[in-house]
UniProtKB/Swiss-Prot annotation:
The gene is hemA. GO terms for molecular function: glutamyl-tRNA reductase activity; NADP binding. It comes from Psychrobacter cryohalolentis (strain ATCC BAA-1226 / DSM 17306 / VKM B-2378 / K5). Its EC number is 1.2.1.70. This is Glutamyl-tRNA reductase. The keyword Transcription regulation does not apply. Substrate binds at residues 47-50, 145, 150-152, 156. Homodimer.
Length: 464
């Protein structure tokens, strides 16, 4: 397959090195352009937790002149290639060629980021062929993420692929592999529970909303305080399709900034002061609060008044603050569902364990899917090999035919002799390769190969 992946992630390298190896902004497009000089297509995935180069390496042998300079390892690699060529061992030679390409990409990456190979090599991991395919699928499915099963990585890979397409760095063959990886990752997520449960506070809060309310466009979300945690929660809940959002905050500028983030043609956004909280509480179906205040902002009395005003329609209250913003006694009120940060953490802990259990099934499915993808790749590759074989055969036959036609135009041409000679040459030409292969198999005692070739030739004769 000649697919390789070279990279670092949160498991292999400290954040200080990951920062130095991260490719940001125009670096990705520049890197993709440079990689085209020694790869048959590449994709670069660079996030806060990983920098990875996925590349198809060429089949050609690297000469000493094409290896990067100033690398003692490159000189060693060249000598290994030469010894493999002498040994005439095709399997070892192919492996050595891939190793040489891997070394070149490593050396290039170090130079591109103005680091030495010795600095980064201990932290780099390398996978090749089906192992590279397995790694790519595990990454795309969220099985290699810091948060097991998280879905963002698939979107990040898709953006990386689009960047490669824009830079003309995605070859047809690599594009085919990418399509296979995306389809397989979708199956892993659909057929296992590895990403089904929320494992962050914001996702857990959003999950609660969908469990209690199903007509979200008609619901109102009240955001009490516009800090970072509440911003994440509000973003996730609003993204579910909530039709109206009210933001109460001491600092009007921060409230307006959050309002700008959440603004949507299908969503009403209102900014209020904290002093208006008792009045707007009655309008809220969902409340998310995280103020950092030392005092209770929503007590039992205020909640009872709000419920009465809304004719006791259910309310979901999410209190992410420590100390609490919402009095714990509110949980005793009928029609109010109150969840504290501890409640959500408990839910998350259970969900993480469920994801770990689901990951076992996901890993088994990944192994199965990689086998299927590799078989499809081999079938696809054999199709190309067959086409090339037929093209070469046609060229050889046509060459012999043209020579015979030229002889027919001679003054002393005997058509019968020319036709006999043509058939002899065609027979010799077409049987040379299988005859040579059978003799080689017999000499080496490879009875399995010998039986395969003989059986194939006999089938060919029966079919004609």
């Amino acid at each position: 397959m000649r697919l390789v992946v070279i990279g670092v992630n949160h498991k292999t390298a400290p954040v200080a090195l990951r920062e130095r190896l991260a490719l940001v902004g125009d670096e990705v497009s520049i890197a993709l352009a440079q990689l085209q000089g020694f790869s048959d297509g590449s994709v670069i995935v660079s996030t806060c937790n990983r920098t990875e180069i996925y590349a198809l390496v060429p089949e050609s042998i690297l000469s000493p002149h094409t290896l990067l300079p100033n690398s003692a390892s490159a000189v060693v690699e060249t000598s290994v290639i030469e010894s493999s060529m002498t040994a005439n061992n095709s399997a070892n030679l192919s492996s050595t060629i891939i190793s040489a390409h891997i070394l070149k990409i490593k050396t290039w990456l170090a130079g591109f980021k103005q680091l030495s190979l010795d600095e980064i090599d201990p932290y780099l991991y390398v996978h090749r062929n089906t192992h590279a395919l397995t790694h790519w699928l595990r990454v795309a499915a969220g099985l290699d993420s810091m948060i097991l099963g998280e879905p963002q990585i698939l979107g990040q890979i898709k953006r990386a692929v689009h960047m490669a397409q824009d830079q003309k760095a995605l070859s047809n063959q690599l594009g085919w592999i990418v399509d296979q990886v995306f389809a397989a990752a979708k199956r892993v997520r659909n057929e296992t529970q590895v990403g089904a449960q929320a494992v962050s506070l914001s996702y857990a809060a959003a999950k609660l909303v969908t469990q209690i309310f199903d007509d979200l466009p008609s619901r109102t979300l009240l955001v009490v305080a516009a800090g970072e945690m509440n911003r994440l929660v509000a973003t996730h809940i609003a993204g579910l399709g909530v039709g109206r959002v009210i933001i109460c905050n001491r600092n009007p500028e921060r409230a307006e900034a959050l309002a700008a983030e959440l603004r949507n043609p299908n969503r009403r956004i209102e900014v209020r002061t904290l002093q208006e909280l008792p009045q707007v509480l009655a309008e809220a179906d969902i409340v998310s609060s995280c103020s950092g205040s030392m005092d209770i902002l929503i007590d039992k009395t205020m909640t009872l008044r709000a419920l009465k005003s809304r004719r006791y329609q259910p309310m979901l209250m999410i209190d992410l603050a420590v100390p609490r913003d919402i009095d714990s006694t509110v949980s005793r009120i009928d029609d109010v569902y109150l969840y504290s940060v501890d409640d959500l953490q408990h839910v998350i802990a259970g969900n993480i364990e469920q994801r770990r259990q689901a990951a076992v099934d996901a890993e088994l499915l990944v192994s199965q899917l990689v086998v299927e993808m590799d078989r499809r790749f081999q079938v696809r590759q054999v199709g190309k090999d067959i086409q090339q074989y037929r093209t070469r055969t046609h060229e050889q036959v046509n060459k012999l035919l043209q020579a015979s036609i030229a002889e027919l135009h001679g003054d002393s041409a005997n058509p019968e002799d020319i036709m006999i000679e043509l058939t002899r040459r065609l027979t010799q030409n077409l049987t040379h390769a299988p005859s040579k292969l059978m003799r080689k198999a017999a000499r080496e005692g490879d009875n399995e190969l010998l039986d395969f070739v003989v059986s194939g030739l006999q089938d060919a004769h029966r079919n004609h």
